[in-house]
Design a protein with these regions (language model features):
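Alpha-helix capping and helix-loop boundary segments enriched in small/acidic/polar residues
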Residues: 32-36, 155, 285-289, 540-544, ...
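Aromatic-lined, polymer-binding surfaces characteristic
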Residues: 273, 719-722, 726-729, 734, ...
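Nucleotide-activated donor-dependent transferases that construct or modify glycoconjugates
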Residues: 279-282, 880, 888-891
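Aromatic-rich carbohydrate-recognition surfaces in CAZymes
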Residues: 301, 493-495, 768-886, 910-918
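Eukaryote-specific, cytoplasm-facing alpha-helical/coiled-coil scaffolding segments in long proteins
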Residues: 390-395, 845-853, 902-904
Length: 945
């Protein structure tokens, strides 16, 4: 919410939800129902003016448009949003949305949103479908720019980059009067069907009918299930724990910490692990009624669209265990879910005697809710209260905040190509951005800090996300892909321990009242800021040779008096692809000797054993591994609850909302400076993690690591130097282009816009060719890496994930040709012909069918090997396939991925590919001749001519 209310109440009954608020003498009552007749949600809002004066009230709706499966949206939200189109229907006070089709036969759905009112209208209705215009850069839904000034929305429509649906309507309300609105959001299979629904629900009476029908339908469902309203309330309450795992209903922490098996361990039971799991443990045949109620709850959820895997574990080891098994089967067979046995979202009946101890631990660990046939009834188990936890004392103010000191003027800098916000330093080695209060860059201006094992994308706001080994598969902190709000799962804070005032040493998430300076350099970023006489300088960088990220906070007291402060670091754990699918399985602990906070996720089968850590070089610190504690209920990183607490609780372990937070209080004399070194890193196992902490902790380790970063990039980027009449080109060529290629493209394979993590066969071969002068070793290692992703037939994986080898096999016609092309370029640039004789295995896998564009799989390594030269020959041979015009067949695309339909029928040809193949043949003929492979050299020459 944008603000706290004077009064707030939420009411849930069958068929609808209700919310009541009171704000500044305005009562609001919102009711929500889903029509059982149409695919629409209706919100009925009633506002009552309790004041003694006339009020002009604006009502603004807001929702973000997806129109795609969840995984598609999560994988790349900014890309997914590009295909959404919006249309304003002013006559109907509605907005239409759809998604442009991307494949033949695709029939995207249509979405609509409308608003009607019964009251005295004020200004004209206005609309917004562009999220950037509504929210504003570096803002959020809590403080959108659309509310800065009264007036209409912009009425933007069309192919907006980030789609929303928002309608604003105002009414004039006299004292002690009410006004009513209906907000309707719905889906249809076609534009015509959507228009029919819009016309229908523009009628307030029909919108009101949805509430009546929703209640009637819910009562009918309960009657058919032989359930009561009280049963439904109980099942709905239990459903909240199925959606948001509640530690109160999960396994004990001691069980969770013992689990060492991943999702694949469930497959032997026919359970995918993709759906929420409820585990019912029963051993007493006399408690069979508990099974009946749980089966009823499961059917109730399925009727509401909540898919849950229900595991019933027969733990009766007596001679009556078969009787219990039969009774359970009879209950299932007599109910509505008889056809859902061993089906996704269905019922899985298993005997405990058939399970190993590891199996039982796994099933308990993955279950969001565990119910037992203990003395408690289902109602008692669901409504069980959490034991009281000793709360951390509130922060006690010991000094009244004085007037906020005027921000010190930021010294002007003589920057090249200054655009009013930022520019390059005179030597071109840093890009400097100045963020004034209330201002922001047009889009996030980020720096990719990386080595070959770890990376982090850091924006000018201080927002960051970090990964190890693979930017897609093993993220340490969340990748958000939101260039508007620029949210972050990493944050730092300074707090005055006398007044309680706090701020971030970076522009986000909790900005102060002054100007921030961000300096992006080669391998590092720096943030400078002064607040109330406290100057901070934050350096962030990644070690050259280890998976360790540094955030060094230098604090200098320029206030003219002694100060007592604290510095806090915060990280939201992911330890996998997505936070929501991993948070249940993350376990944290603190090493009592070093104070390091460790985290692991053994459920992630590809990275099981990885041990992640954070540390700070200050013995007097408090910690927490509980995000709910740090942020608070409905809290944000802009105003975390921890800033109103005396210290952090020290709580870590399993079954928490996982995070890492370290807080270190300190004293600072007048004119004194102190340095705090925060480490974020990961080891392949606990021992490597311990070694990394010991090696890099403290100022000396941080300083040495930074000097190594400087030296590496100075040496690497100093290889190529150009002097041209164009100073802009000089800056790019003399450092930045090669830096971006190596750090972002080759090592990171990630950026702010896209977080792929995979190697693209053509992509990184091209990247390393660009580095032949600066870093030729990258070209050599990647030629061999890429060759190992070639199938025995000569084609290759279009892209693949390192660590696992899973990837995509396609009909692309150019991928494999980049191998001989880049091999020729490498040998010519370096003279290293020995690489051509290195033996590299091939892959084996099924061929791509003629009627499919690609498939994703884990191919096997073949027993057949060949030298890199032989891999190149096989690639060229594969490319010598021509169409009726004598041009190479394009397959499902050449270098232009957008040409994927040209060769859909196996006949399309590519002019571009003909030029490229010609170049490859001419280059490789010379290479073949130098190796005395005259026959293939002649063939290359003949094919080229």
């Amino acid at each position: 919410a944008c603000r706290w209310s004077d009064h707030y109440e939420a009411i849930f009954v069958e068929g609808r939800a209700e919310y009541r608020r009171r704000d500044e003498e305005i009562d609001s009552h919102m009711e929500i129902a889903v029509s059982p007749e149409d695919d629409v949600e209706v919100r009925r809002i009633t506002l009552t003016n309790l004041s003694s004066r006339r009020r002009n009230i604006e009502l603004t709706s807001y929702a973000e448009v997806v129109l795609a499966p969840q995984n598609s949206d999560l994988a790349h939200p900014a890309f997914s949003n590009l295909f959404v189109q919006t249309e304003i229907l002013g006559d109907s006070q509605a907005i239409l949305c759809t998604r442009r089709a991307r494949a033949p036969g695709e029939n995207p759905p249509w979405m609509f949103h409308l608003m009607t009112t019964q009251g005295t209208p004020g200004a004209e209705v206005s609309y917004e479908t562009n999220r950037a215009t509504f929210i504003g850069r570096a803002r959020s839904v809590a403080n959108p720019v659309a509310f800065d000034l009264p007036g209409p929305l912009s009425n933007t429509e069309g192919s907006v980059l980030d789609p929303i649906i928002s309608i604003r309507q105002s009414v004039i309300m006299d004292a002690d009067t009410s006004a009513n609105w209906h907000l309707v959001t719905g889906m249809a299979e076609s534009r015509e069907a959507a228009l029919v629904l819009i016309g229908r629900y523009c009628d307030p009476n029909f919108a009101a009918r949805a509430f009546e029908m929703a209640w009637s339908h819910s009562q009918l469902e309960l009657h058919q299930m032989h359930a009561t309203e009280a049963d439904a309330q109980l099942y709905a309450r239990l459903a909240s724990s199925m959606i948001y795992a509640n530690p109160l209903h999960r396994a004990a922490a001691v069980i969770l910490t013992r689990n060492r098996r991943g999702q694949a361990g469930l497959w032997a039971f026919g359970i995918s692990g993709d759906l929420p799991i409820l585990l019912l443990r029963i051993a007493d045949v006399h408690r069979i009624n508990l099974v009946k109620h749980v089966l009823q709850a499961h059917a109730y959820w399925r009727g509401k669209g909540l898919e849950v895997d229900l595991i019933i574990l027969n733990e009766d080891f007596s001679g009556y265990r078969q009787e219990l098994q039969d009774r359970i089967l009879n209950l299932i067979g007599s109910g509505p879910e008889v056809y859902r046995i061993d089906e996704p979202g269905g019922i899985f009946l298993r005997r405990s005697e058939d399970l190993t101890e590891e199996d039982r631990i796994l099933l308990q660990s993955v279950s969001r809710v565990i119910l037992t046939d203990s003395a408690e009834s289902l109602t008692q188990q669901v409504t069980r209260q959490a034991p009281a936890i000793r709360k951390v004392p509130r922060f006690a103010v010991t000094r009244t905040p004085s007037a906020v000191m005027a921000p010190e003027p930021v010294p002007s800098r003589d920057l090249l190509f200054y655009n009013g916000i930022g520019g390059f330093t005179q030597d071109g080695r840093e890009y400097v951005v100045q963020i004034r209060p209330g201002k922001a860059t047009p889009a996030p201006w980020s720096n990719v800090l990386a080595n070959d094992r770890m990376g982090s994308v850091v924006s000018e706001s201080g927002a960051a996300y970090t990964w190890v080994d693979n930017a897609h598969e093993f993220r340490l902190t969340p990748w958000n892909n939101d260039p508007i709000s620029d949210p972050s799962g990493e944050a730092f804070y300074l707090r005055d321990e006398e007044t309680g005032q706090f701020w971030s040493p970076t522009p986000l998430p909790a900005p102060g009242n002054g100007t921030y300076t961000c300096r992006h350099g080669f391998g590092y970023s720096v943030f400078e800021y002064t607040q109330n006489g406290i100057n901070t300088e934050v350096w962030t960088y990644v070690a050259v040779d280890s998976p360790v990220k540094f955030v060094v906070v230098k604090v200098r007291n320029q206030s003219g008096r002694a100060r007592r402060l604290s510095v806090t670091g915060y990280w939201e754990w992911v330890l996998g692809q997505w936070r929501h699918s991993n948070l249940m399985h993350i376990v944290t602990e603190v090493d009592p000797a070093s104070g390091t906070l460790y985290a692991r996720n053994d459920y992630n089968r590809e990275f099981a054993g990885k041990t992640v850590f954070v540390n700070v070089n200050e013995a007097a610190r408090t910690v927490t591994g509980n995000r709910t504690e740090f942020l608070g209920r409905n809290g944000t990183t802009a105003r975390p609850a921890a800033m109103w607490q005396d210290h952090l609780s020290g709580r870590t372990g399993a079954s928490l909302d996982p995070c890492a937070a370290l807080q270190a209080p300190f004293d600072l004399a007048k004119g004194q400076e102190r340095e705090f070194v925060f480490l974020l890193g990961a080891g392949n196992d606990a021992e490597e993690a311990h070694q990394l902490v010991r090696r890099f902790s403290g100022s000396a380790g941080a300083k040495l690591a930074l000097e190594c970063v400087w030296e590496f990039w100075k040496r690497t980027l100093g290889t190529v130097h150009a002097e041209t009449p164009d100073p802009a080109l000089n800056i790019l060529v003399n450092g930045w282009l090669e830096y971006q290629t190596l750090a972002c493209r080759y090592w990171g394979r990630s950026g702010y816009y896209q977080s792929g993590g995979a190697y693209g066969f053509r992509d990184q071969l091209q990247d390393t060719t660009a580095l032949l002068n600066a870093a030729p070793w990258t070209a050599r290692e990647h030629l061999l890496r890429a060759a190992a992703r070639q199938f025995i037939e000569g084609d290759v994986q279009h892209w693949w994930h390192p660590h696992t080898g899973r990837g995509v096999r396609t009909h692309f016609s150019d991928d494999f040709l980049w191998l001989p092309y880049c091999a020729c370029r490498y040998v010519k640039a370096t003279g290293d012909t020995g690489v051509l004789d290195v033996q590299v295995p091939f892959l084996e896998g099924r061929a791509v069918n003629a009627d499919e564009e690609s498939y994703y799989d884990l191919p096997q390594h073949s027993d057949e090997e060949g030298t890199l030269y032989e891999h190149c020959v096989r690639a060229i041979t594969r490319g010598l396939r021509f169409g009726s015009n004598g041009l190479p067949l394009i397959g499902c695309g050449d270098w232009n991925d957008g040409m994927n339909l040209v060769g859909a029928k196996g006949k399309g040809e590519s002019v571009w590919l003909a030029f490229f193949l010609y170049d490859v043949l001419r280059r490789f003929s010379g290479l073949a001749r130098s190796r005395n492979d005259v026959a293939f050299a002649d063939r290359c020459t003949q094919e080229a001519e």
